[in-house]
Amino acid sequence: MKLQPLADRILVKRLAEETKTKGGIIIPDTAKEKPAEGEIVAVGPGRNAEDGTKIALEVKVGDRVLFGKYSGTEVKIEGEEYLIMREDDVLGIVQ
């Protein structure tokens, strides 16, 4: 897959969602919520500061991140679903 995000945008692949609760109840597809956790697949070069310098992103490829439920734009590339979002949409990095 070849997609290079621009500026401070990142490409995220959602992590697989749980199909069972801790109590063993199977969750049907119609009741599942999209996970708000994913892995960064590609990052842009960073955003431009007012003085013209480039501000590097704090996240990097391979980071596991948390993001808002409605963050980003869903795109389909080579049959796989991804999200393109700004770095500001990332709430935190899972260590």
Curated annotation (Swiss-Prot):
Has the keyword Ubl conjugation been applied to this entry? no
**Assigned keywords, A-Z:** Chaperone, Cytoplasm
Q: Which InterPro entries does the entry mention?
A: Chaperonin_GroES, Chaperonin_GroES_sf, Chaprnonin_Cpn10_CS, GroES-like_sf
GO MF annotations, alphabetized = ATP binding; metal ion binding; protein folding chaperone; protein-folding chaperone binding; unfolded protein binding
Q: State whether it acts alone or in a complex, and with which partners, per the record.
A: Heptamer of 7 subunits arranged in a ring. Interacts with the chaperonin GroEL.
- The main location class comes to cytoplasm
Claim: GTP-binding is one of the keywords in the record: no
Q: Any one cellular component term from GO for this entry?
A: cytoplasm
Gene Ontology biological process: chaperone cofactor-dependent protein refolding
The superkingdom of the source organism is Bacteria
Q: Which PANTHER family match?
A: 10 KDA HEAT SHOCK PROTEIN, CO-CHAPERONIN GROES
Family, according to the entry, reads as follows: Belongs to the GroES chaperonin family.
PROSITE patterns, per database record: CHAPERONINS_CPN10
Q: By what name is this protein known?
A: Co-chaperonin GroES
By its UniProt entry, which HAMAP family does this protein fall under? CH10 (MF_00580)
Q: What this chain does, per the record?
A: Together with the chaperonin GroEL, plays an essential role in assisting protein folding. The GroEL-GroES system forms a nano-cage that allows encapsulation of the non-native substrate proteins and provides a physical environment optimized to promote and accelerate protein folding. GroES binds to the apical surface of the GroEL ring, thereby capping the opening of the GroEL channel.
